Amino acid sequence: SGWEIIATGGTQKLLEDSGVKTTGISDVTGFPECLDGRVKTLHPAVHAGLLAMRSNPEHMSQLEKLGINTIDIVVVNLYPFKATISKPGVTFADAVENIDIGGPTMIRAAAKNYQDVAVVVDPRDYERVLSELEAGGITLETKKYLQYKVFAHTAVYDSLISNYLAQQLGIRFPESVTFAYEKAQDMRYGENPHQGASYYNEEFIRVGSLSKAKQLWGKELSYNNINDTNCALELLREFRDNTEKIAVVGVKHANPCGVALADTTAEAYQKAYDADPVSIFGGIVVTNGTVDADTAAEMAKIFLEIIVAPAYTPEALEILCKKKNLRVLELPGIREELPEGLLDMKKVMGGLLVQEFNQGGIGELTVPTKRQPTEKEMEDLLFAWKLVKHTKSNAITIAKDQVSCGIGPGQVNRIWAVEQSIERSGEAVKGAALASDAFFPFDDCVKAAAAA
């Protein structure tokens, strides 16, 4: 009681229908809402009431002369621009019509005068504000927090609009960039225990991305868990078009350690495990096949950090959910195509590197040797090539029968990577295929591979 509620069109009708007495915005401004609601609150009677500093006698005197009352609390939900452009088939005209003008103007004005006006843009803050009102008044600390929320909110809102308009114009790398992300979770620590960390979702979460995954079992994901799992999913995506085979990818410290294609998930997992049974311990396993009881039973024999799959049978979950330290994630849409225009970003000290997301495959192949590769050899070459694309440089991968044999990642010279991958391949190196993530500057790598 004691509060006068000023409301615009739709909000006023909802409140009045619910038995809440309101004052229409037109009664405050003395001017009707017009242009299909485009102009409602853009009026001095509103903005002077928001911006007048109560501690400034001149401000208060001017309000009195103009017959304008102060406004103490503003509650606004902006037009749903994000929801609008997320709809399939949305037109440019519909998108533009859902760009809020009066709302952002009003909440920014209110936030500037934070000492006198509380402004609420996030429904999650309603309870806090109401409890303080019931206790006697909104504290200055809360008003400053709400001020911050306003400018963060409008920054995200404007970012969505500018990025949408840039996309419509085909602008890949604009003069300035802003990206909107929403916090998904805080983490116990980052890459190392002394580093704080959080995980943020993109405003538009991509189908098949880690942010879409549903955690079925286990503790919260750590910083390193998310980084490694993302690396595994990016490699797994290379096999999305192979609908005849199931792929299993094992990753350790952001590098593949065992990768295989097979007719069943269980067979593919066993081959991936056998490729490097030492490194996969404590690793990440992702697959584009359903995990059944047989697969789960094999997976449960060792310590794995995370398993990601599009689906699990009830029997598989019963087995896996007995593993205390395992995280089990379900990710439908794991074979979905990525949209065009994705960007890859890397923060560097004082700047941001932005490039097109690497969705490139192999175009036309040239065989300079007299002997052409057999169909099977070509299959293994292409398989090894997909692996090396997602292995830290200098990288060499060796594969046979569409299973990784030896992976040599992150070496400072290429011959070391070759020697490492050959050593790890063991006897399987005979008749295998080798891929390199860059050219051979000298013949030493070729000679080492031929000698193996």
Q: For each predicted feature, which ranges?
A:
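N-terminal phosphate-binding or glycine-rich loops at protein starts, especially the Walker A/P-loop
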Residues: S1-G24, R108-A109, Q115, V121
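Short hydrophobic/aromatic-enriched beta-strand-loop microsegments
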Residues: E4, G19-P32, V74, A118-V119, ...
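Active-site/ligand-binding-proximal alpha/beta "capping" segment
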Residues: R54-A110, T366-E375
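Non-catalytic interaction/clamp surfaces of large macromolecular machines
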Residues: P123-R124, R128-S176
